[in-house]
From Swiss-Prot:
Keyword Membrane: yes
Name of the protein in question: Fibroblast growth factor receptor 2
General function of this protein: Tyrosine-protein kinase that acts as a cell-surface receptor for fibroblast growth factors and plays an essential role in the regulation of cell proliferation, differentiation, migration and apoptosis, and in the regulation of embryonic development. Required for normal embryonic patterning, limb bud development, lung morphogenesis, osteogenesis and skin development. Plays an essential role in the regulation of osteoblast differentiation, proliferation and apoptosis, and is required for normal skeleton development.
UniProt EC number: 2.7.10.1
């Protein structure tokens, strides 16, 4: 009896051992099916090999000398920058690497008439995983089994079966999944084009992941095209699903230009011609049209070619549009050689053609007769104009004779005309809203001019402004210089003002002068006067653009303000980005000044002081942004345009401005949706301005369309922490972006906190080159039409509105090197 019990125990143990070993045996069998990756057509003899573990960073450097253009590809597909992959010229950085980042990387350096390519092999491996199933986080769910009753096979995740057609480039990895369930657990087999799919049917074989119900084929080729059917079956039934695979062949070659194009052509002066250049390229081509002027030689006296770039792909220009070059109203200067230059990541190709210009003989013969015709036309036209002027003057004289009550008045008449100049940017003592105070500032009187008055702006009557002795400046001591730009109400020019500084009565001081344009309207004059009066009332402060004087008498209105030689803050920061961070082919350019972390904190502190002063004067800015902040020669930060009169009821926030920026990106939700402007809405804008500073002039909410931005702001999403920013400063930003205005800090609190941070910051904390900055492209606006909440998201949830903790700093931008020494 004892021997039989002992024998049965051994049988049960052996049976249990076999049942437990069977899954392990299947998995081991799967791993034996993994072939070595065959060499692809992109590989060379000795590529650089880089290995890393998941979650680590990978950096590739491609230094191939002076290159016009450097492009990066992965497995033959061109790469673009995103939140995990950063491309800066010859540098490629992959943050938080995953197994799907493994592959063959290539950098191509393009030069005139030649190109060079360097290759890298990146392996992201984990000892516990093959790397094929990094996105199969729900694999355990696929094996859910109902032990209570038997059941035929069924699909457990129909969403993974929705995409039936898969079109991929050659050399990519393809994975088909058929997650199923059943009791007993169904078996899986695969068919290709209706026949059993075996390892020997494909060079390199394939992988079957039974635990994830998947079929994996690496480095696909055109012969892999076809229908792939998964069959799930057990003793109670079977189900199947079919995928269709289409493999697009990629060809690594420089652009191919159609023979015979562009073609030589001849035309006469004044004619129109076009050159056509047909470009065929698998990779994205870059096309340029160049003109070598006809002067007997391609080389000028300075040793440089007479070369001019006429047209280049960029912005919203398509390849089809750039393939045609139009030369209209041809002159002799247009003669010469025209070259179509096309390049991609593999190399450069070009074709040239000649334009010959001949004199227009018919035009020369007709020139004499046309001159007589023009003279006759001018004479007749002049006579008719003289008759019209005479008739108008006679009617005017008769009308004046009838109105005897005006006959005794002098040549200059004064008509009382009150313009609605209101303090739209001030607030009352009991409210912080900018829409409550409507006190008129100044009374302007129009003046009808006699015939002797000549200095009259087109479209605007000449006005008599009341003289203010405190601010009036002699017009003869002001020397106007070059234009600085156009503002809201007119134009701004540089000038020299003698004696405007009371401490230096004999010295000339460089100032900026605001004046109306030639086509200014009465509203433009009203707005300029309103801004001048507002600046008078606000007074002076170190961190705002101060009013120095005005010329209001005996001539056009000149408003004299301080001059900031280094321009607006946004461009000031962008030109001082570390080498390699700006959008430029020359990544080794030395920035104008080496910025430190303390410089950025000091800039933020000065802005907070300026806004604290404006808030104390009950002034609401309503357009606080880096583009409206100026920098002086001594790097003093000054807030500008705080006195502008804006019609807040008629702004179309859905239209882009002329320079492509959307003002909604700096506006608080209550200002955006309810048109309520308060000091708290300025605090929100200050938080966005801080984000601009610590991204060195980055564009807020990059790639987010306006309609999506409205939705995301309402849902409580906010931008993530910039790379050159500590956790403490980012907390200050998010406090400024509180959904409830009363929960945001005041400018006084911001000044106190920034003063404390500034005193704890050393001068040696230079910006880290490895920290990613927002890409800056002056020609290419963001074109993404949707946002992602994955790695590409630029938002993080608002802790107040979403009841979530702050985003983990370890999963966002890389911190600065000095962050460990700062309070966080």
């Amino acid at each position: 009896m004892f021997s039989w019990s002992y024998l049965m125990g051994l049988v049960m143990v052996a049976t249990a051992t076999l049942s437990l070993a069977r899954p392990s045996y299947n998995i081991a069998e799967d791993t034996t099916l993994e072939p070595e990756e065959p060499p692809t057509k992109y590989q060379i003899s000795q590529p650089d090999v880089h290995s890393a573990l998941p979650g680590e960073s990978v950096e590739l450097r491609c230094l191939l000398g002076d290159a016009i253009m450097v492009t990066w590809t992965k497995d033959g597909a061109q790469l673009v920058s995103n939140n995990r992959t950063l491309l800066i010229g010859p540098y490629l950085q992959i943050r938080e690497a995953a197994p799907r980042d493994s592959g063959l990387y290539a950098c191509g350096a393009t030069r005139p008439l030649q190109s060079e390519t360097r290759y890298f092999i990146v392996n992201i491996t984990d000892g516990n995983s093959s790397g094929d199933d990094e996105d199969d986080n729900d694999g355990s769910e696929d094996f859910t089994n109902d032990n209570n009753h038997k059941r035929a096979p069924y699909w457990t995740n129909t969403e993974k079966l929705e995409k039936k057609l898969h079109a991929v480039p050659a050399a990519n990895t393809v994975k088909f999944r058929c997650p199923a369930g059943g009791n007993p657990l169904p078996s899986m087999r695969w068919l290709k084009n209706g026949k059993e799919f075996k390892q020997e049917h494909r060079i390199g074989g394939f992988k079957v992941r039974s635990q994830h119900w998947s079929l994996i084929m690496e480095s696909v080729v055109p012969s892999d095209k076809g229908n792939y059917t998964c069959i799930m079956e057990n003793e109670y039934g079977s189900i199947n699903h079919t995928y269709h695979l289409d493999v697009v062949e990629r060809s690594p070659h420089p652009p191919i230009l159609q023979a015979g194009l562009p073609a030589n052509t001849t035309t006469k002066v004044g004619g129109d011609r076009e050159f056509v250049c047909k470009v065929y390229s698998d990779a994205q081509p870059h096309i340029q049209w160049r003109h070598i002027e006809l002067n007997g030689s391609k080389i000028g006296p300075d040793g440089n070619p007479y070369l001019k770039v006429l047209k280049a792909a960029g912005g919203n220009t398509t390849v089809k549009e750039i393939e045609v070059l139009y030369v209209r109203n041809v002159s002799f200067e247009d003669a010469g050689e025209y070259t179509c230059l096309a390049g991609n990541s593999i190399g450069i190709s070009y074709h040239s053609a000649w334009l010959t210009v001949l004199p227009d003989e018919e035009r020369q013969l007709d020139s004499s007769s046309s001159e007589y015709t023009e003279i006759a036309i001018y004479c007749v036209g002049g006579f008719l104009i003289a008759c019209m002027i005479g008739t108008i003057m006679m009617c005017h004289m008769k009308g004046r004779g009838k109105k005897s009550d005006f006959s005794s008045q002098p040549a200059v008449h004064k008509l009382s005309k009150r313009l609605p100049l209101r303090r739209q940017v001030t607030v009352s003592a009991d409210s912080s809203s900018s829409m409550n105070s409507n006190t008129p500032l100044v009374r302007i009187t129009t003046r009808l001019l006699s015939n002797t008055d000549t200095h009259l702006l087109a479209g605007v009557s000449e006005y008599e402004l009341p003289e203010d002795p405190k601010w009036e400046y002699p017009r003869d001591k002001l020397t106007l210089g070059k234009p600085l730009g156009e503002g809201c109400f007119g134009q701004v020019v540089m000038a020299e003002a003698v004696g405007i500084d009371k401490d230096r009565p004999k010295d000339a001081v460089t100032v900026a002068v605001k004046m109306l344009k030639d086509d200014a309207t009465e509203k433009d004059l009203s707005d300029l006067v309103s801004e001048m009066e507002m600046m008078k009332m606000i007074g002076k402060h170190k961190n705002i653009i101060n009013l120095l004087g005005a010329c209001t008498q005996d001539g056009p209105l000149y408003v004299i303000v301080e001059y900031a030689s280094k321009g607006n803050l946004r461009e000031y920061l962008r030109t001082r980005r570390p080498p390699g961070m700006e959008y430029s082919f020359d990544i080794f350019r030395i920035p104008e000044e080496q910025m430190t972390f303390k410089d950025l904190v000091s800039c933020t502190y000065q802005l907070a002081r300026g806004m604290e002063y404006l808030a104390s004067q009950k002034c609401i800015h309503r357009d606080l942004a880096a583009r409206n902040v100026l920098v002086t020669e001594t790097n003093v930060i000054k807030i500008a345009d705080f006195g502008l009169a804006r019609d807040i009821n008629n702004i179309d926030y859905y239209k882009k401005t002329t320079n492509g920026r959307l003002p909604v990106k700096w506006m608080a939700p209550e200002a955006l949706f309810d048109r309520v402007y308060t000091l708290q809405s300025d605090v929100w804008s200050f938080g966005v301005l801080m984000w601009e500073i610590f991204t060195l002039g980055g564009s807020p909410y990059p790639g987010i369309p306006v309609e999506e931005l409205f939705k995301l702001l309402k849902e409580g999403h906010r931008m993530v922490k910039p790379g050159n920013c500590t956790n403490e400063l980012y907390t200050m930003m998010t406090d400024c972006w509180r959904a409830v205005p009363s929960q945001r800090p005041t400018f006084k609190q911001l000044v106190e906190d920034l003063d404390r941070i500034l005193t704890q910051t050393t001068n040696e904390e230079y910006l880290d080159l490895n920290n990613p900055l927002e890409p800056y492209s002056p020609s290419y606006p963001d074109t993404r039409s949707s946002c992602s909440f994955g790695d590409d998201s630029v938002f993080s949830p608002d802790p107040m509105s979403m009841n979530l903790a702050f985003p983990n700093p370890n999963t966002q931008m890389a911190p600065l090197k000095h962050e460990a020494t700062q309070p966080a």
